[in-house]
């Protein structure tokens, strides 16, 4: 990974850090688009979807189908559950999952097909529980939830396709390096969260 790419990654992470509590809606763009952008604006959601998509794509096309199906179903169940969980608890769960998945990604661990859908369902369900909108009124809530589901699914699909398309040896190495950086970033955020709780 060259120096420019490292700088871009660091600046991106620093830019995302103020958005750690970005569950509040953006004004004047509507409920659907707020939901659509939600996975991009919450760092723990963004990191977990990125590493999940990279890992699933690394496993190859046969693994992507159960991964996508498991994620879509679990995300839908989480959104439909209608019971939010504490934001800090969700952040911890997602970042710990991202850390574990990033280790598998960095070491290019091959997962059996029957095992691929388990981390996808875990991440999808927690994302769904942590994506409950602040809107009132069932129509607004429904639009926000629909946007959240579609945004997360499209983001995961794009990352999976990108990762699966990286077939050259140097590209596979770059994916593994990205996994290591994502894991390091997740650990950094976890460390900061732990430090803030103990301070």
Regions found by a protein language model. Name each.
Residues 2-10, 17-199:
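Membrane metalloprotein/metal-transporter helix-bundle signature
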